[in-house]
Amino acid sequence: MKNNFYKHFLPSEIIDNFDLVKINELEDKEHIEMRIYLDEKLVYPDGYSDGELESRGFTKSVFISDFPIRDKKVILVIRRRKWRVKKTGNLIFRDLEIRESGTMYSKEFAAFLKKNSTIMQ
């Protein structure tokens, strides 16, 4: 998508490493959910070059909760790029940490919730 407005709302590691594919809104009786679809950019993993790897498409989508926008629940729908090492046939991925370990939250959203959980108690 050519419009760059989304860069004001998404975590920096998402902007740096993923391309925006589309945005959908899903509505039910209780809430509106915004799904932001992102595909990992075509960037080789560290230590590899063009001739050593072959792109093998994307992983299945992962759903990550992020900060709400204008009372809408935000879900980042992320597809990671898979690479095959030509010499060995092994599949590898870039080393990206886009969600908080042990959660389905973006790192920033998890830090916000953790910081503010003591305020709410």
What are the language-model segments listed below?
Residues 1-44:
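N-terminal alpha-helical interaction blocks
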Residues 7, 19, 45, 49, ...:
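Compositionally biased, intrinsically disordered low-complexity regions enriched in proline and serine
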Residues 1-4, 47-52, 90-92:
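Generic detector of short, locally flexible boundary/turn motifs and exposed helical patches
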Residues 64-121:
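Short, positively charged, Gly/Tyr-enriched micro-motifs
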Residues 18, 22-23, 51-53, 81, ...:
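General N-terminal targeting signals
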Residues 2, 11, 37, 56, ...:
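Short linear sequence motifs
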Residues 32, 37-84:
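N-terminal juxtadomain amphipathic helix
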Residues 5, 59-62, 93:
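Residue-level signal for pocket-adjacent positions within structured domains
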